């Protein structure tokens, strides 16, 4: 018995009739008639044998007992009217029964045929008849699919849910799984994990692998790990790659099952060989870190590559890292950038950060700070802490953007609050120096401490400084030493240097020059210029090490070449006096000048001396005064004294006794004995100041009590002659002897004069010479007398 499909389409009138896919010619007059009149024959100009006869005329099967299956596409009321007429006019009782029994299967069959032929609209209509009129759950599922995907009908997730539910309530596992997905993903209904789990579990108990996997996920979300493992296992046994992957994670971490990393790797492999990208990436992790398998970077690279080619962003990023570092593959920065870009374009923050690094450092791509900032910003806006830190640094240093300390603080704070130690350290600097925020030593110390406790050596050093100097912390040198030691152990050269200073001074630790030397040496060997300079001092003076002036020169040279002004000055002294190196006044001047140009007041003073005496340069008192002034204006007491003498005697500068006194005063305020003596001379002789012998004695005494031989000599003269003090030969002799003991030649002459007699005129001459500071003449006179 053959089955013949009759398809009738109706809108406002009869549109078409197809018999086994062949369209019937319908007179226009028939199309507009009521449904019942389609079945009646028409005579006259319009030839129409009635629908039943016309169908049979198109039936080429020649079977008397052919069964006709009718599909009416149109309004429901017209359909019911049509089907009633079919039973009345077209078919016998036996055929009608066959249609009722077999039509629902025919609709499904026809729908599948239309689907295969690519006629989505006709497929939907056929499924709809089977679903609506016959309640077939598989058809209801297909109708829901059509609504969900907009296939053959306007997309409607709400309608999809209606039909999934009809099928699900008839225990259709696929529909139950799909309905669970709707509740889980809020497709056509409000999100409801409880309902999702109910329908997933209903499908899962029927053996639906996808539902078993999703049931496992929902239980895992509730931390019901044992239940999750149960359902993952069932799905994994059906080779569901997603379930194998999730079950692998459970075995790796021991969630809901005993930890078994080898089992985890095995499950990742099963999912990976099925092409599941997440599992391929995870298997790459296993080989990269030796998780459950022997570490094999080449295998790791291969699995990352497989996942990366499928678009897995994390695998693409890891592939970039492997190409960057030459791990598991030949180093190729260009390839690295390519993979970072793919992952970054997908929005992976870590890859965006890595791509920023490539642009900032010119790795595999032309250096471009602006592009670096662009990618750092994208990652930072996703709250990727490392990128927030680097973006903060860019604003702090002006890399790719204008320096903006407030913006720097904003990003550094975000990273610091996520625990990035480097960000905490730099944020501490911002609070310490007042960059982008108000200066706050307490906050600076607090951020240093957070970073220091994470092992950040720079913060440990800074925290040590806080404790040493009472910055945001109570002063505690022992605590300072503790943090310096931690930083020094991490190789921080600044901390090693400061620790050396603590051992040198005995701050927070017992004084120990050998330990100080070792700390300075470690720091110096790392290139710390200050430590190199200090190490030179230790070698020069034999502090904690055998004295070695050649080594002193070596370390001064290293520091000097780094621009350390103190070392440059010291190196100049070494060359001037031939200490540890052959005497070379030309090189002495060279290093003095470098140091002086760097603002070192001692070098400026020394350069002034060289110009005053013509050592290594043409004697030039004007230039001498110029360099003395530079040093004096920086507060160097001896240079202030020297500049005072230049004004006092008009050496290289216009004679001005008042300015001389002004500079002597600046110098004596710092306790300079030579200036005290010369200020005494000014008071004694009334140069630049009103004559006052008592004041003169006061300043001579200050100078003398510091052990300055010329001050002692002048004070002795006052006692001998009763100038500003009562005449006192014994005190005069006492101070002359002190001056003589320190090699002041005029003092020897004065002592012998007092102990003999008749040389008063010579004494008066010597005292006069002392008053104007002509020491060399007094010394010469002393030697003559002694001879």
Model regions and ranges:
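Hydrophobic face of amphipathic alpha-helices that form TPR/SEL1-like repeat modules
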Residues: 109-113, 130, 142-149, 178-185, ...
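Short helix-capping/linker turns of helical repeat alpha-solenoids
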Residues: 114, 133-136, 149-151, 169-172, ...
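TPR/TPR-like (Sel1-like) alpha-helical repeat modules
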Residues: 268, 628, 730-745, 752, ...
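Canonical positions in the second alpha-helix
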Residues: 129-130, 166-167, 202-203, 234-235, ...
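Acidic, low-complexity, intrinsically disordered interaction modules
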Residues: 35-71
């Amino acid at each position: 018995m053959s089955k013949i499909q009759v398809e009738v389409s109706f809108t406002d009138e009869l549109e078409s009739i197809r018999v086994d896919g062949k369209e019937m010619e319908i007179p226009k007059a028939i199309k507009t008639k009521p449904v019942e009149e389609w079945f009646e024959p028409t005579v006259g100009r319009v030839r129409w044998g009635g629908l039943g006869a016309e169908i049979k005329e198109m039936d080429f099967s020649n079977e008397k007992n052919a069964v006709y299956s009718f599909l009416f596409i149109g309004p429901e009321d017209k359909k019911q009217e049509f089907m009633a007429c079919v039973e009345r006019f077209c078919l016998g009782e036996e055929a009608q029964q066959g249609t009722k029994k077999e039509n629902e299967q025919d609709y499904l069959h026809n729908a599948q045929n239309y689907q295969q032929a690519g006629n989505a609209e006709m497929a939907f209509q056929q499924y709809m008849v089977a679903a609506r009129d016959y309640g077939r759950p598989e058809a209801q599922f297909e109708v829901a699919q059509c609504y969900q995907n907009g296939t053959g009908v306007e997309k409607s997730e709400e309608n999809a849910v209606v039909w999934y539910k009809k099928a699900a309530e008839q225990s259709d596992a696929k529909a139950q799984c799909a309905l669970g997905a709707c509740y889980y993903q809020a497709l056509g209904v409000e999100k409801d994990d409880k309902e999702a789990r109910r329908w997933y579990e209903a499908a899962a108990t029927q053996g639906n692998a996808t539902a078993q996997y999703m049931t496992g996920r929902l239980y895992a979300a509730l931390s019901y790990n044992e239940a999750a493992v149960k359902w993952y296992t069932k799905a994994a046994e059906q080779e569901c790659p997603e379930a194998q992957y999730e079950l692998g994670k459970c075995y790796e971490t021991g969630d809901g099952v005993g930890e078994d990393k080898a089992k985890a790797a095995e499950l990742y492999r099963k999912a990976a060989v099925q092409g599941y990208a997440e599992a391929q990436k995870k298997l790459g992790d296993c080989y990269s870190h030796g998780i459950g398998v022997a570490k094999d970077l080449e295998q790791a690279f291969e699995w990352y590559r497989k996942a990366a080619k499928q678009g897995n962003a994390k695998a693409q990023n890891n592939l970039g890292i492997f190409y960057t570092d030459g791990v598991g593959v030949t180093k190729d920065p260009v390839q690295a950038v390519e993979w970072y870009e793919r992952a970054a374009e997908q929005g992976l923050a870590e890859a965006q950060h890595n791509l920023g690094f490539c642009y900032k450092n010119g790795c595999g791509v032309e250096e471009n700070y602006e592009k670096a900032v662009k990618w750092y910003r994208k990652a930072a806006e996703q709250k990727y802490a490392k990128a927030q830190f680097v973006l903060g640094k860019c604003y702090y240093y002006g890399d790719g953007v204008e320096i903006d300390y407030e913006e720097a603080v904003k990003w550094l704070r975000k990273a610091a609050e996520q625990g990035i130690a480097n960000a905490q350290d730099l944020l501490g600097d911002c609070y310490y120096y007042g960059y982008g925020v108000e200066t706050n030593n307490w906050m600076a110390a607090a951020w240093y401490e957070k970073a220091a406790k994470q092992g950040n050596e720079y913060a440990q050093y800074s925290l040590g400084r806080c404790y040493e100097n009472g910055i945001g912390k109570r002063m505690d040198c022992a605590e300072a030493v503790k943090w310096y030691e931690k930083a020094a152990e991490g190789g921080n050269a600044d901390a090693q240097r400061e620790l050396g200073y603590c051992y040198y001074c005995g701050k927070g630790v017992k004084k120990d020059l050998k330990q100080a030397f070792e700390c300075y040496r470690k720091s110096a060997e790392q290139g710390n210029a200050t430590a190199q300079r200090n190490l030179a001092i230790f070698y020069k003076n034999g502090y904690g090490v055998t004295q070695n002036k050649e080594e002193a020169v070596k370390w001064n040279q290293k520091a000097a070449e780094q621009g350390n002004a103190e070392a440059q000055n010291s190196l100049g002294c070494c060359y001037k006096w031939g200490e540890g190196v052959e005497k070379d006044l030309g090189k002495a001047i060279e290093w003095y000048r470098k140091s002086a140009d760097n603002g070192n007041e001692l070098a400026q003073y020394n350069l002034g001396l060289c110009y005053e005496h013509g050592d290594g340069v043409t004697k030039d008192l004007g230039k001498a005064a110029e360099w003395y002034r530079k040093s004096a204006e920086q507060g160097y007491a001896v240079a202030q004294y020297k500049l005072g003498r230049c004004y006092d005697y008009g050496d290289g500068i216009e004679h001005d006794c008042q300015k001389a006194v002004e500079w002597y005063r600046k110098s004596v305020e710092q306790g300079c004995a030579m200036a005290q003596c010369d200020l005494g001379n000014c008071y004694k002789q009334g140069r630049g100041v009103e004559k006052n012998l008592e004041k003169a004695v006061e300043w001579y005494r200050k100078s003398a009590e510091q052990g300055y031989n010329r001050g002692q000599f002048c004070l002795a003269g006052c006692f001998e002659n009763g100038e500003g003090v009562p005449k006192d030969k014994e005190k005069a002799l006492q101070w002359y002897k002190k001056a003589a003991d320190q090699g002041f030649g005029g003092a020897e002459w004065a002592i012998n004069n007092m102990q003999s007699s008749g040389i008063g005129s010579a004494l008066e001459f010597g005292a006069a010479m002392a008053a104007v500071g002509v020491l060399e003449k007094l010394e010469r006179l002393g030697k003559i007398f002694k001879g």
